[in-house]
Amino acid sequence: MLNRRECGAAVEVAARRHLERAGLRWLASNVCFRGGELDLVMYDVMSVVFVEVRYRQQENHGSAAQSVDRRKRRKLVMAAQLFLQRHPFLAQVPCRFDVVEGAGRPLQLHWIRDAFRLDDC
């Protein structure tokens, strides 16, 4: 049986593969900054996509996507800004924030494109 960290890593790998099959290109994983982390950074037809991957075995407390609250969105935006500062060639490209939620066993993935916008933070 996988512990929480191993389970999270497995869901992130599954999410990355799912997005790659959909045509996105992988740029980075688990990019850490003070105060925030980007699970996946992908590229999709002239857009940089910052992807938050969430997993819940059960939805007793809401869906995994619902757990990306205003505070978490702010952290993701700050981390994305720092990422773009370190990669200025990508800062000229539009960006968006997606969420991939995983639930259950066997794992079911649900990709939410454009899950939130900067003005939602």
UniProtKB/Swiss-Prot annotation:
HAMAP family hit by this protein: UPF0102
Pfam families on file: UPF0102
Molecular functions per Gene Ontology: nucleic acid binding
Record-stated family: Belongs to the UPF0102 family.
Species per Swiss-Prot/TrEMBL record: Xylella fastidiosa (strain 9a5c)
Cited Gene3D superfamilies: 3.40.1350.10
Signal peptide: none
Matches recorded under PANTHER family: UPF0102 PROTEIN YRAN
Recorded superkingdom: Bacteria
Protein name per its UniProtKB record: UPF0102 protein XF_0554
Higher taxonomy: Bacteria, Pseudomonadati, Pseudomonadota, Gammaproteobacteria, Lysobacterales
SS bond partners: none
